[in-house]
A protein has these predicted regions:
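N-terminal, positively charged/glycine-rich alpha-helical extensions of SAM-dependent methyltransferases
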Residues: 28-52
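Conserved Class I S-adenosyl-L-methionine
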Residues: 43-47, 88-90, 209-302
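Class I SAM-dependent methyltransferase SAM/SAH-binding core
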Residues: 80-136, 160
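A short acidic, Gly/Pro-enriched loop at the edge of an enzyme's catalytic core
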Residues: 134-145
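Conserved catalytic/acceptor-binding region of the Class I
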Residues: 159-160, 166-241, 257-260
């Protein structure tokens, strides 16, 4: 039976399901960034307020990386999961499809993203709630596994976010994440971000990009007292029908929209030309390129 989160935390009944191989502020999704060209400065925000557009832009990437991530985790069936920063439910859908969970609770600060998540088939099992990654509205030891999928760099205090993940899992429970390698310039949007920076413009980026480094993830997990900490790289590729398909899809990004909207039309045309040259098409006009994610897993000590 599913549970609604409560402000006053209560205990949760039910024996944890384990497997040795698997277990061996409220607006944190909005990043306030100052961008500027020359003497012109403007504050921009990353606002995740359109679940459908986000699905078109990031859905394929997220699913591709999430499939590999779950292959690596190899979780047993029937676990109680919490998906923190579930967004529009892309990874939650994978959990329901592949892991036959006993329960899934999705938490995200964006009601617009959650509205999209509730339209997915996964909503027949998963329950979605508005909430804060740094103050999860669940009792201690409520879940067998806690996951953040492509989220950690948006949490203002990553260590606090990880400590909350640890708190809500049972002793021996799994704490896992994967995050695009933004620090290393290997996120799906980096072909555009790199050219924006080359033009002398500071793009809108998440507040804690440093948390995407593999070393940072390992340090966060070890610092949280987790055991059996392991890491791995995940590399995925995506193909677009042509450059126009690539541009129309990626400009839906909540990180790119405010930056490009603040640019002069001539600068936008220059940016498009630079990105087009950076991503040569094949003989049929298709654009294919890759992105890299860093993943980490650990378990709460028994």
């Amino acid at each position: 039976m599913s549970r609604r989160p409560k402000s006053a935390r209560r205990g949760h009944q039910g024996a944890p399901v384990t497997s040795q191989s698997f277990l061996s502020p409220a607006k944190w999704h909005r990043s306030r960034i100052v961008i500027g060209v020359g003497n012109q400065m403007a504050e921009q925000q990353i606002r995740f307020d359109d679940g459908a557009s986000y699905e078109q832009m990031m859905g394929i990437w997220s699913r591709s990386a999430g499939e590999i991530f779950l292959d690596w985790l190899a979780p047993p069936l029937g676990l109680r999961w919490i998906d923190i920063g579930c967004g529009n439910g892309a990874f939650t859908e994978l959990l329901v499809e592949r892991c036959s969970p006993a329960e899934v609770q999705g938490i995200d600060p964006s009601e617009e993203q959650l509205a999209f998540a509730r339209t997915r088939p996964a909503s027949r099992l998963a329950k979605f709630h508005q909430g804060d990654a740094m103050a999860l509205p669940f009792a201690d030891s409520s879940f067998d596994a806690a996951v953040m999928a492509l989220v950690l760099v948006f949490v203002p205090d990553p260590a606090k976010g990880v400590s909350e993940m640890v708190r809500v899992v049972v002793p021996g429970g799994a704490v896992v994440t994967y995050m695009w390698d933004m620090w290393g310039g290997r996120s799906p949007l980096d072909p555009i971000h790199s050219e924006i920076q080359a033009m002398g413009i500071v793009p809108t980026r998440p507040p804690r990009m440093d948390a995407s480094r593999m070393e940072a993830l390992r340090d966060l997990w070890i610092g949280a007292g987790l055991e059996d900490v392991q890491t791995r790289e995940i590399t995925v590729h995506r193909t677009f029908a042509n450059f126009d398909d690539f541009w129309r899809t990626n400009i839906k990004s909540p990180a790119l929209r405010p930056t490009v909207a603040a640019m002069k039309s001539g600068d936008v045309e220059t940016l498009i030309s630079r990105v087009r040259a950076r991503l040569p098409a094949d003989a049929d006009g298709r654009i294919t390129y890759g992105a890299r994610a860093h993943a980490v897993r650990g378990r709460r000590p028994k």
